[in-house]
Amino acid sequence: CRVRQCALGVHESCPLARGAKLSPGQHPRPSHAVRGRTAPGTRSSRRRTCEDGTSGPRDPRGATVALLYPLCDQPSAHLQTLPLEHRPLFRVIVEASRESSRKGDAPPSRRTGTRIHRELKLAHNQWLRANRESAIWPWRTAAMNFVAALAPRLQTHQHMHDLLMTCAFWCCLAHAATCSCAGLYSTHCRHLFRAFGCGGPASATASG
């Protein structure tokens, strides 16, 4: 693969940006934990504030877990801008986000993670057969391989967050120039922007 960086329309080196330049080869970096913070003055933030002004332990049932699933409130207008063939998968991703955000202190469903992986792999393989020369091939392959590696060891809400955001990133590469979620991916999917060394197609490197 040749290397570019991508931030879905909000980064100069997006694959669809004009004049994108190639950069030296780098391997995808692991994702970083997302630390959700409750807005000051909210009920949950006041409840966690001790008498001495310090913050108490985070309540997993509160906003912290919910903040890991920013796709829960996706407007229908965004879905309508995706290609028809990607809309069913994106709906499944949003449904999984909502389901996971309601788990509270219970772990996320590994069955849901397996299902999302299976659905993404099917969509990726179908797309790959007709689009091996596509400009977004490196990023989609990197996203697919990341999900294939993460799904079997999914245990925490952070894992589920990374899996769902990566799957959504895969979908939204199809409408990078107009995607209203670009800001989310710039925050949560930066580990996929450098896709050099992403390996072969996931259909050849991943099983399950």
Curated annotation (Swiss-Prot):
Zn finger region (unnamed): 167-179
Subcellular location: Virion tegument; Host nucleus matrix
Induction profile: Expressed late in the infection cycle.
GO CC term, one of those recorded: viral tegument
Keyword set includes Zinc: yes
Any one GO molecular-function label of the UniProt entry: zinc ion binding
PTM annotation, UniProt: Phosphorylated.
Keywords: Host nucleus, Late protein, Metal-binding, Virion, Virion tegument, Zinc, Zinc-finger
Pfam families attached to this UniProt entry: Gene66
Alphabetical list of InterPro entries matching this protein: EHV_Unk
Positions of the UniProt region annotated as Disordered: 17-61
Superkingdom as given in the UniProt entry: Viruses
Family: Belongs to the herpesviridae US10 family.
Protein name: Virion protein US10 homolog
